[in-house]
Amino acid sequence: FLLILLRLRAPRQGLGGSWKGGLALFLYAWLFSVAYVQLGAGVGALVLFGAVQMTMFLYAWIRGERFSGRVMGGMLMAFAGLVLLLLPGAAAPPLASSLVMALAGVAWGAYSLLGKGSLRPLADTAGNFLFSLPLLLLLAAGLVVGDGPVVGTSGVLYALASGVLASGAGYAVWYGVVRQVSAQQAATMQLSVPVIASLGGVWLLGETLSLRLLVASVVVLGGVGLALSARRV
């Protein structure tokens, strides 16, 4: 799909991307898929993008970007929201799946940071997908050799729709946006996703919006708002 778009928009433009982008994309998609087997839509999104935020803020700090007390307070508040969500208890999500989702968030944070230097979002996204293909084929071969999952027609159609629209086109758009904002802005922008995912889970999947998830979401988004309201120093 991306190759077709690339040929239509820029017939003479070659593919971009890198093996680093392909690796980050593969790890994100694989870990994300494994983790969501046992996590609800809202919980998974909150853990995922909380990890994304921490990854990108840490990168910005290592690169020499200094933050005000308000930004640091917002980061700590958002992190506290994630801790609140994962505290042991009857309403706590599975810890192993949550940790896998956090690793997926680190991979997506790395993928987003790699996109900050992208001047050709569509070409780079298409190239990154191609670079991830060998790893995907190895994973598919492993599933075939082992006791692979049963694949139905509806599952294939959902996967195609997700890959073409949400992943292919969506990632290209994100690469076009992320290069125009700072690392901390990119990180905080993405934390609106858990709220959307939670509402979608309740509306489309019949999931229950627990009090713990609701409170954790408010704390995380409050931290994001606090961080965004501060000026960089």
Q: What role is predicted for each listed range?
A:
Residues G44-A51, L114-P134, S167-W203:
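Helix-helix packing/entry segments at the starts of transmembrane helices
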Residues F1-L6, A29, Q53-A60, L82, ...:
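Hydrophobic transmembrane alpha-helices of multi-pass small-molecule transporters
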Residues R9-F49, T55-F57, M77-A80, L84, ...:
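Specific transmembrane alpha-helical segments of multi-pass solute transporters/efflux pumps
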Residues F1-L5, L25, F67-L87, A104, ...:
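Hydrophobic transmembrane alpha-helices of multi-pass small-molecule transport proteins
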Residues G14-L15, L87-A107, G142-A161, T208-V218:
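Juxtamembrane helix-entry segments on the extracytoplasmic side of multipass membrane proteins
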Residues G14-L23, G64-F79, S98, R120-F131, ...:
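Cytoplasmic-side transmembrane-helix entry/capping segments in multi-pass membrane proteins
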Residues F1-L5, T55-F57, A90-G146, V173:
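Transmembrane alpha-helical segments that form core, pore/gating elements
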Residues A35, W61-F67, S118, D124, ...:
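Hydrophobic/aromatic residues within transmembrane alpha-helices
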